Amino acid sequence: MQPAGISHSLFPSLPPEFLPLALYTLAASILIGVLLLAAWWLGAKTTNRNKELPYESGAIPTGSARLAYPVPFYLIAIFFIVFDVEAAFIFAWATAWRELGLQGLVHITFFIVILLLGLVWLWLKGGLDWGPSRARRGHVRD
């Protein structure tokens, strides 16, 4: 029999399902630390020029491997990430549309309208133009 106020759990306010998760997280963190330490300890300490060269099917590299990507590439990548995350929200809504009813339909319609307004604004600002601008192509009317 236990005296009043003493609990079996180390953290009585946490649910009992927390202990396996905490132990798993601790074990994974220790394993990662051990593997990183072993890689550092067992890894090669010396470097030379031949070890740092990229290996491409036995071909000797010529020139620099660094390529300058145009800035619009990064803009398109960021726009893709933003719209991809928003698509994830739409897919989540689509899986629960029966439970959400009319209120969910109104909310997702509002969400999609905001997305479309953002896309139109982006298009009008020239964020989706990849090539030369219209002013440089001579298509601007006076």
From Swiss-Prot:
Its main location: membrane. Keywords: Cell inner membrane, Cell membrane, Membrane, NAD, Quinone, Translocase, Transmembrane, Transmembrane helix, Transport, Ubiquinone. It is an enzyme of class 7 (translocase). This is NADH-quinone oxidoreductase subunit A 2. GO terms for cellular component: plasma membrane; respiratory chain complex I. NDH-1 shuttles electrons from NADH, via FMN and iron-sulfur (Fe-S) centers, to quinones in the respiratory chain. The immediate electron acceptor for the enzyme in this species is believed to be ubiquinone. Couples the redox reaction to proton translocation (for every two electrons transferred, four hydrogen ions are translocated across the cytoplasmic membrane), and thus conserves the redox energy in a proton gradient. The keyword Transmembrane helix applies. Gene3D superfamilies: NADH:ubiquinone/plastoquinone oxidoreductase, chain 3. Its EC number is 7.1.1.-. It is a multi-pass membrane protein. It is found in: Cell inner membrane. One of its GO terms (molecular function) is NADH:ubiquinone reductase (non-electrogenic) activity. HAMAP family: NDH1_NuoA. It catalyses: a quinone + NADH + 5 H(+)(in) = a quinol + NAD(+) + 4 H(+)(out). It comes from the Bacteria. Belongs to the complex I subunit 3 family. The chain crosses the membrane at residues 18-38, 73-93, 104-124. NDH-1 is composed of 14 different subunits. Subunits NuoA, H, J, K, L, M, N constitute the membrane sector of the complex. InterPro entries: NAD(P)H_OxRDtase_bac/plastid (IPR023043), NADH_UbQ/plastoQ_OxRdtase_su3 (IPR000440), NDAH_ubi_oxred_su3_sf (IPR038430). Disulfide bonds: none annotated.
